[in-house]
Amino acid sequence: VDKRIYVAPARFSGPRGQGGQEEGPLNGLRLVVKDLFAIKGERIGQGNPDLLASAPIERQTAPAVLALQQAGADYRARTTTDELAYSLNGTNGHFGTPQNPRAPLRLPGGSSVGSAVAVARGEAEIGLGTDTGGSIRVPSSYCGLYGLRPTHGRISMTGLKPLAPRFDTVGWMTRDLATLTQVSEVLIPETTATRLPARIILLVPEGLAAGPYQRLLGPLSRRLESLGFQCERRMLSQAFMARASEAFRILQGCEIRRTHQAWLNTPEQGPESRWPRLNPDIAARLKWCMTLSDSDEQAAEAKADTVRRWYRQQLAASHEGGETACEDGSAAAHTQAEATSEAVFVLPTTPGASPLLGASLEVMEAYRHRLMGLTALAGLNGAPQLSLPWLTDDAARLPEEAAPPPWGVSLMGLPGRDESLLALARMLED
């Protein structure tokens, strides 16, 4: 058993198909679960050995896990997470970094890293995790998986250790869309009538080098138009993405400070300290969270409001000539704007393929800001986002890599439109 991936193996070595606790639509599908969920008889470690050692044994299983088991899923193992789920890299200095099965020279992505790698290796069909700032979407992109961040608040977070409750969601990853849809039907049972959008907005991030994503847009537009959708292209300015990233980073930091204040407010060292041993990068981020003020939070909230207004204006109504994420980060609609039907965004899940292993902290921090310029959009809006393994990053491929590394493309919609994203993806893959 690879301890970089698995914290508490259950029946990991058994054959597939022996069933879960119940007969149901997920019968015979192996389930692995991120080390943030309560599972009866196990401890929650949150990616930290000190927290694991001091954690109580759980008396109940989290409702999200229990729902999958009752639908027939076969729970196999608890999987590793980046420490406190506060990273998108898939690294953990305590337990090691799991190898990305699709790109061994590159990061696997986090923080739901163990679940992603287990599924990508074929050791499970369902990888349950969480997504706050991208922890389902990013490893899905890097490992070539399907991954869904559902609408915030749609699935119970009971029995989970939080990071930033305002943004935390349950999420899941699979190797195929059919399984992802099956899991969605179990975890999002209160399904309303699926409303397909009339418009698809193809977002092109400013500064994204010409390559696989842009080459996809032509054939994708033709395919969508053949299915009756109206396609529009819009640019995401660097200034707008920076505004979204910074707003999310500060609001998330304020939430994290409140989540962990019981021990963050104690001395870092000495007899009164309640701090666990932390990796240096995570410790530095937590210390930064402690510096945030009420005025910082208010300023970030104002920035987030501009992002939210733009998001809803884009998706809730079409505009003659379109609407652009302007250089100042505001949403500027043309005066002849006319409300019609809803839309869905298409965008790259990440700025490209996964970064290489061994990149410096400075390089990774700069990359994290670019990455969060994309992932923050769903987080700030409480919106669903579906990452699809439709691309490989040919331009990033190194001579020593056997194949081009994976790169995800996302569908992203208004809150509550999770089923619409899944239905649209099925239409495009048929």
PLM region descriptions:
Residues V1-A124, G321-E327, H334:
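Gly/Ser-rich catalytic/binding loops embedded in alpha/beta enzyme cores
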Residues L31, E185-C254, T266:
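Gly/Ser-rich, acidic/histidine-flanked active-site/gating loops
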Residues L29-P49, I250-D305, C326-G329, A333, ...:
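Short helix-loop capping/hinge segments that flank enzyme active sites or metal/cofactor-binding pockets
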Residues V33, Y75-T80, L128-T130, R233-R234, ...:
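General beta-strand structural signal in soluble alpha/beta enzymes
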Residues R121, I126, T132-G207, A383-D430:
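Structural helix-boundary/capping segments
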Residues N89-Q99, R243-T259:
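Charged, often glycine-rich, active-site loop that binds/positions anionic groups
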Residues S295-D430:
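Glycine-rich, small-residue loops and helix-cap segments
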Residues G93-G96, G144-G147, I250-L251, V363-E365:
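Short, hinge-like loop/turn segments at secondary-structure boundaries
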